[in-house]
Amino acid sequence: MCGIVGYVGPQSALDVVMAGLKRLEYRGYDSAGVAVLADGGLATAKRAGKLVNLDKELSEHPLPAAATGIGHTRWATHGGPTDANAHPHLDNAGRVAVVHNGIIENFAPLRAELAERGHELPSETDTEVVAHLLAEEYSACADLAEAMRLVCGRLEGAFTLVAVHADAPDVVVGARRNSPLVVGVGEGEYFLASDVAAFIAHTRDAVELGQDQVVELRRDGVRVTGFDGSPADVRSYHVDWDASAAEKCGYASFMLKEIAEQPKAVADTLLGRIDGSGTLSLDEVRIPPGVLREVDKVVVVACGTAFHAGLIAKYAIEHWTRIPCEVELASEFRYRDPILDQQTLVVAISQSGETMDTLMALRHAREQGARVLAICNTNGSTIPRESDAVLYTHAGPEVAVASTKAFLTQLVACYLVALYLGQVRGTKYGDEIGDVVRDLSGISGAVERVLGTMDPVRQLARSLAHKNTVLFLGRHVGHPVALEGALKLKELAYMHAEGFAAGELKHGPIALIEEDLPVVVVVPSPRGRSVLHDKIVSNIQEIRARGARTIVIAEEGDEAVVPYADHLVRIPATPTLLQPLVATVPLQVFACELATARGNEVDQPRNLAKSVTVE
């Protein structure tokens, strides 16, 4: 959620930190601040609101030149979005500065202890206690990394901490527990950040920090230890995208750019995973085939858009493998005492690899003996590291808060998992699996075709900008697509939108239908299971008879829907189970255009964060 940047090196620390914070704006925030070490002391600036407010403060009251600094964009949890609650937080002497992501669950008793010892804590935040505790420990040991280890031993909750001390002018110290923090390694300079995007303009070499570790950056190197002080093994890796991938490149918004990048993202996610004979080759799936053959249940855990990918995966997994599949909201999973064992495969889906609810669900599953396969877009993140295996999507950085290309690549990865399980287990649908693999190989071109026909969708969206409600209907895999379309409209347009299984209309939702109410209907292919198609055509007739304005998404050549569609959006003919890959795209464009017409910020919708790293 929050964005954190730290820097030690020869450049202007303030310039590096501010540029890094701007690259992390997509994570969502409501205040920002910086601290630099200069002239034997600390200099800070912080302001509520967007970074432009902090820029203004810095132009009016410049900070001294410095080579060491930290910065933060805050998403309010404890205390409102005010100047006083913005980070960095200082001790009473103004010698320690701390920035923090996460929640310190035992901050209240710690705050009371500090108050009893005479500390004054003017903010409402949980973070402030850390600055005061660090000051106490540093006064005793004169070692900022050791002080951080001692303080972390007293904290409960999930947190990333980054701190500097005026007495250690070339040192930045960080710590992580259940919250992301990554080290950037440059030429004689080092970076700390909650996301590699913060330093990608300077280096693509990174170090992955493990759970309960403290890192110390100095001009001459990096040292990583556990909270207990023992040396820690770390993994270095090279980021496979550059700074231009996280820039708009002429598009009006990151979301529009990322929608347009979907054909390439889909193709990249398939690259190298299908050999010349049409056989799947998933070397990343380190779970032995013999173990996969013993799997008797699959459980998908995810949140938000990734949950909708999981709902679609259920249809594919059960059809191609004949293994029962459950799909769970990660935030609810561990609280209902799920039945798991060594024959259970848990698939954890997360774009960032740091989604806290999904991470906690994963850990619960492993405690019960289940195998965990992660589907993730972010190398070096926590969820892949703590899973038995990982299938990376290759969407590249997704900056807009509302997920688009990550969703399509998650779908591709889910299909690959389902097909691979079917291939390993030798199910009776083996011949069909070969056909589907060939269809998947051509899906990038189908997505490209959809994108080339979106002008009528944009025009329609603009004409509906004054509406307050839009409903979405679908059957089979079209139902999760309807849910995803509704979610996108909620996130971006701030309007009431609901997705329903079309067969549930008569069980309540039909009461919402009124004159000129826009209803988007995702129509399954008339080929194959034609009963699904026939029933949804009846649903369209039913709502249109009650005055609804029908917006119908149907494949090319489907003439049965034409008499009942007020607006018809054509998509390429695709096998039923793969249809979400093309049917979702018009809904993304629709939501983005409608939100823009309403004057909303599509890249950073209100109240939302890109990576939800707290429960």
Curated annotation (Swiss-Prot):
Q: What is its main location?
A: cytoplasm
- GO CC, one annotated term: cytosol
Report which reactions are catalysed by this protein. Answer: D-fructose 6-phosphate + L-glutamine = D-glucosamine 6-phosphate + L-glutamate
Catalytic site positions? 2 (nucleophile), 610 (for fru-6p isomerization activity)
Output the GO biological process annotations, alphabetical, semicolon-separated.
carbohydrate metabolic process; fructose 6-phosphate metabolic process; protein N-linked glycosylation; UDP-N-acetylglucosamine metabolic process
Question: Would I find Lipid biosynthesis among this entry's keywords?
Answer: no
Which GO terms label this protein's molecular function in UniProt? carbohydrate derivative binding; glutamine-fructose-6-phosphate transaminase (isomerizing) activity
Keyword Repeat applies: yes
Q: Which residues form the Glutamine amidotransferase type-2 domain?
A: 2-220
Q: Which residues form the SIS domain?
A: 287-427, 460-605
Task: Cite the InterPro entries for this sequence.
Answer: GATase_2_dom, GFAT, GFAT_N, GlmS/AgaS_SIS, GlmS/FrlB_SIS, Ntn_hydrolases_N, SIS_dom, SIS_dom_sf
Pfam assignment, any one: GATase_6
Q: Where in the cell is it found?
A: Cytoplasm
For this protein, the Enzyme Commission number is: 2.6.1.16
Query: Which of UniProt's keywords are assigned here?
Result: Aminotransferase, Cytoplasm, Glutamine amidotransferase, Repeat, Transferase
Q: What does this protein do?
A: Catalyzes the first step in hexosamine metabolism, converting fructose-6P into glucosamine-6P using glutamine as a nitrogen source.
| Quaternary assembly | Homodimer.
What this protein is called in its record is: Glutamine--fructose-6-phosphate aminotransferase [isomerizing]
